[in-house]
């Protein structure tokens, strides 16, 4: 008896009919047994039929025989959504309510949570909130109904027509505002007063094109960086955009970057960081390709956001804010080269732009936006760098406001003049010192005023606004909460040894 037959008989006696260590036919040095079986599947994958064409042996994946199976009797198989008990839902709702308004707490895996059940809607102002209390169902429908006809707010058909026209007009206005995210609202405020007509130049940054660019940036960003001017952070803060994001996109992260901190004292930058950190994470920054400040802290913060969203292939970071606050300069600083066009004038960035920072982090540059407000005067808009000074008519009328906002010794040190009594004398002295005279020896007031305004906006003249919670005044002279904070002329300087902490 051959060796193969002896081995086969031994396996039969031991009850082991498996192949064991027998090699597959065709297995050699170049192909292992797994590869040979894989190739045999292609070769022998045809079905076998008899002379009549009936199927005798089906090819792989051709058989229609369904094996007997049993479905697990679990309620999750028979529901179209995930299920959760009311106790667990209430417990999670209480835990979420404690951390909901904390900007330093991040909710992960939001898509797997029933956010519509966790967020309780306020129905106190809804007209149908208390309809069951005023008109019970049993007294309205059924055999005990007492209402003869539906109650209508209008007393007559004419009143109903007027109400319909009013609602239609409000709907058209809302439809027009929706294209600008609802931010270009009417200029009339809650206190009932409105601002007088302004020049067309002071409405820059409020067009529909700008709002469309802002909408695209917010919609495409996972993290939104609000760039503020360190000299006047509250003036360059877009509160209406923040309210919109809080209401419509609560899952997006919003942080503040206090740019141009090199133009203010160190103690002031630290005070503003402490004040703004109560609302959002805030960083002090100085945009410069060669000598920057805060670059490492910002990159580290962006990497933390990237680690929080490991389930995504990449995250996008959008930069928004007032014109000429340094959004494009911050992007150039992070990339350490010029990838965005920058200029010391507002409106240089026209459309949004995608820039790659690293493999998983992308940056989005946005044009500057100016949320309309009736309380903003022409001086406020001009001093925030929203408009170009050369397009302003009669720029000398804004020089008195410059003298009020700046300290006298700063102006004397910048222009090397002294002894002026008012704005007119200041312009005349500066024009004669620089030799800017017209025919007849008259000073060029318009040209000198434009120069002073440009120096004011570009940081050549030191000025700043102190935080509102610094050095509170007595109760008798306390200003309202919505008033303008004190200027540099009123703010006392603390000791110079106070260092900035980011």
Curated annotation (Swiss-Prot):
The GO biological-process annotations, alphabetized, read as:
ribosome biogenesis
Q: Which domain of life is it from?
A: Eukaryota
Question: Which residue stretches does the UniProt record annotate as biased composition, category Basic and acidic residues?
Answer: 468-482
Q: Which GO terms describe its cellular component?
A: nucleolus
> Which CDD domains does UniProt cross-reference here?
NGP_1
CP-type G domain: which residues? 211-372
Any transmembrane segments, and where? none
Give UniProt keywords alphabetically: GTP-binding, Nucleotide-binding, Nucleus, Ribosome biogenesis
Q: Where is this region: Disordered?
A: 1-20, 459-502
Q: Where is the signal peptide?
A: none
Q: What is its main location?
A: nucleus
Q: Which GO terms describe its molecular function?
A: GTP binding
Under SUPFAM superfamilies, the record lists: P-loop containing nucleoside triphosphate hydrolases (SSF52540)
Q: Provide the residue positions that the database annotates as binding GTP.
A: 321-328, 365-369
Q: What does this protein do?
A: GTPase that associates with pre-60S ribosomal subunits in the nucleolus and is required for their nuclear export and maturation.
- Family assignment from sequence similarity: Belongs to the TRAFAC class YlqF/YawG GTPase family. NOG2 subfamily.
Its name, as the record gives it, is Nucleolar GTP-binding protein 2
User: Corresponding gene?
Assistant: NOG2
């Amino acid at each position: 008896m051959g060796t193969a037959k002896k081995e086969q008989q031994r396996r039969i006696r031991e009850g082991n009919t498996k192949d064991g260590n027998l090699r597959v036919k065709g297995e050699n040095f170049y192909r292992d047994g797994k590869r040979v079986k894989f190739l045999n599947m292609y070769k022998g994958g045809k079905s076998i039929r008899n002379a009549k064409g009936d199927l005798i042996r089906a090819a792989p994946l051709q058989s229609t025989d369904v094996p007997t199976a049993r479905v697990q009797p679990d309620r999750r198989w028979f529901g179209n959504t995930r299920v959760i008990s009311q106790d667990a839902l209430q417990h999670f709702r209480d835990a979420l309510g404690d951390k909901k308004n904390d900007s330093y707490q991040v909710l992960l895996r939001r898509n797997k949570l029933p956010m519509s059940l966790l967020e309780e809607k306020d129905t106190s102002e809804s007209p149908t909130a208390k309809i069951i209390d005023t008109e019970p169902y049993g007294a309205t429908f059924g055999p005990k109904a007492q209402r003869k006809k539906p109650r209508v707010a209008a007393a007559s058909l004419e009143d109903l027509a007027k109400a319909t026209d009013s609602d239609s007009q409000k709907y058209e206005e809302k439809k027009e505002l929706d294209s600008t995210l609802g931010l270009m609202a009417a200029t009339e405020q809650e206190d009932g007063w409105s601002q007088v007509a302004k020049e067309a130049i002071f409405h820059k940054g409020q067009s529909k094109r700008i709002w469309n660019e802002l909408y695209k940036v917010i919609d495409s960003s996972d993290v939104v960086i609000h760039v503020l001017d360190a000299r006047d952070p509250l003036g360059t803060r877009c509160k209406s955009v923040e309210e919109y994001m809080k209401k419509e996109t609560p899952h997006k992260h919003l942080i503040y970057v206090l740019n141009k901190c090199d133009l203010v004292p160190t103690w002031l930058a630290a005070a503003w960081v402490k004040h703004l950190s109560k609302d959002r994470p805030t960083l002090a920054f100085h945009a410069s390709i060669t000598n920057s400040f805060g670059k490492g802290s910002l990159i580290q913060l962006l990497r933390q956001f990237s680690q929080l969203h490991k389930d995504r292939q990449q995250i996008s970071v959008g930069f928004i804010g007032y014109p000429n606050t340094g959004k494009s300069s911050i992007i150039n600083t992070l990339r350490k080269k010029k990838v965005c066009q920058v200029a010391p004038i507002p409106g240089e960035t026209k459309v949004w732009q995608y820039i790659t920072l690293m493999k998983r982090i992308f940056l989005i540059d946005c044009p500057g936006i100016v949320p309309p407000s009736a309380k903003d005067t022409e001086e406020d808009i001009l001093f925030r760098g929203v408009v170009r000074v050369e397009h302003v008519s009669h720029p000398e009328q804004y020089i008195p406001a410059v003298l009020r906002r700046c300290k006298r010794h700063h102006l004397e040190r910048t222009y090397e003049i002294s002894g002026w009594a008012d704005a007119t004398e200041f312009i005349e002295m500066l024009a004669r010192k620089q030799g800017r005279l017209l025919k007849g020896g008259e000073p060029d007031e318009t040209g000198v005023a434009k120069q002073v305004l440009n120096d004011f906006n570009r940081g050549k003249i030191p000025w700043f606004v102190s935080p509102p919670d610094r050095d509170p005044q007595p109760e008798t002279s306390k200003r309202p909460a919505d008033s303008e904070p004190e200027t540099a002329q009123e703010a006392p300087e603390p000791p110079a040894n106070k260092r900035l902490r980011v």
